[in-house]
Amino acid sequence: MGGLQPWHWVIVIAVFVLLFGAKKLPDAARSLGKSMRIFKSEIKEMQAESKGDEPKPATPIASERVDTTAPEQQSTDRHTA
């Protein structure tokens, strides 16, 4: 139960033979094989490209830090008497 029995495969093959004819089946299988081969080669090519595009870890740049805070100003409130 749940799997295909041998007689299921016989029915599937018979349907293919009736639909496509015995002469067209080898050509259909050949073109399906070519399509699968092209598909696999494209997947391998995409994986090779994605491995080359991996981001490299960032390297810190050594730089001098400049103190940008203003010095504290002294109070200019002078009392004149």
Curated annotation (Swiss-Prot):
The chain crosses the membrane at residues 1-21. It is found in: Cell membrane. Keywords: Cell membrane, Membrane, Protein transport, Translocation, Transmembrane, Transmembrane helix, Transport. GO terms for molecular function: protein transmembrane transporter activity. GO terms for biological process: protein transport by the Tat complex. Residues 46-81 are annotated as: Disordered. HAMAP family: TatA_E. This is Sec-independent protein translocase protein TatA. Part of the twin-arginine translocation (Tat) system that transports large folded proteins containing a characteristic twin-arginine motif in their signal peptide across membranes. TatA could form the protein-conducting channel of the Tat system. Belongs to the TatA/E family. One of its GO terms (cellular component) is TAT protein transport complex. The Tat system comprises two distinct complexes: a TatABC complex, containing multiple copies of TatA, TatB and TatC subunits, and a separate TatA complex, containing only TatA subunits. Substrates initially bind to the TatABC complex, which probably triggers association of the separate TatA complex to form the active translocon. It comes from the Bacteria. Pfam families: TatA_B_E. InterPro entries: TatA/B/E (IPR003369), TatA/E (IPR006312). The keyword Transport applies. Residues 46-56 have a biased composition (Basic and acidic residues). It is a single-pass membrane protein.
